[in-house]
């Protein structure tokens, strides 16, 4: 190694030392001329082309935060929920794409989309860590300004629940004042859930699924079905013979596992910030959220682990 000296190049570029400019480098070009030459060959003039901000509609997104209270912490509360809604939008997009793929018996693309939804849910789980930096005192300062608005009223979350099979006709009521939104939520309620379509897939693959399970009232929550569990039992006992269905089963378990973690972190964050006070939307708050932890989306896939 060459010792430092007059002829040695400068060390780490982050140290503040400056190396002599190599002879082959162009000299520094000041002012407007530098802009014309570009910076690392990057395009710098976007007066006639689409920029990053244009493509992402950043003006609209970054102007969508309107705190109602004078409290500093309300910005965190707003952005936490807005970003969660964006992730839910993507989760719904991917789930619906996976559902279409399952209907068309194209399982590999569905696996990719389901895996992405699980990663989205992991992202949502981690987001609670940011909101949990808000203390009870800080939340109390802004809570009076929230009125009766609550995450309970999120129509994207409701569609996500319905699409995953947790159906409840009463959950249409919070959206009755918005006919356009009500139509979207009702359509998801009345259609087969993702798991319903997977059960139909089992039937198409030759498993004897009870007819009443294949054609039921889609607005009702799912109940455990012995014929569906028997099909999954066969899949798990002979995975090599039913590899695509085996992989589908595990993707669904991954998905529900991530969904449960999201729900759990929601509960613990609420308990940490507001304790056991009533929620702004009128629910019992943390006790209501804890009750939701008992909801099982894909019952046969969990029970079959006991019978194997």
Swiss-Prot record:
EC number: 1.13.11.11
Sequence segments annotated as region (Disordered): 1-35
Cofactor binding note: Binds 1 heme group per subunit.
Source superkingdom: Bacteria
InterPro entries, sorted: Trp/Indoleamine_2_3_dOase-like, Trp_2-3-dOase_bac, Trp_2_3_dOase
Gene Ontology biological-process annotations: L-tryptophan catabolic process to acetyl-CoA; L-tryptophan catabolic process to kynurenine
Compositional bias segments (type: Low complexity): 17-30
Any one GO molecular function term: metal ion binding
Pathway: Amino-acid degradation; L-tryptophan degradation via kynurenine pathway; L-kynurenine from L-tryptophan: step 1/2
UniProt KW keywords: Dioxygenase, Heme, Iron, Metal-binding, Oxidoreductase, Tryptophan catabolism
Known catalytic reactions: L-tryptophan + O2 = N-formyl-L-kynurenine
Amino-acid positions noted as binding substrate in the UniProt annotation, renumbered to this chain: 77-81, 139, 143, 280
Binding site for heme: 266
Cofactor section: heme
Its biological purpose: Heme-dependent dioxygenase that catalyzes the oxidative cleavage of the L-tryptophan (L-Trp) pyrrole ring and converts L-tryptophan to N-formyl-L-kynurenine. Catalyzes the oxidative cleavage of the indole moiety.
NCBIfam families on file: trp_2_3_diox
Family per record: Belongs to the tryptophan 2,3-dioxygenase family.
Complexes and interactors: Homotetramer.
Protein name per UniProt: Tryptophan 2,3-dioxygenase
Lineage, uppermost ranks: Bacteria, Pseudomonadati, Pseudomonadota, Betaproteobacteria, Burkholderiales
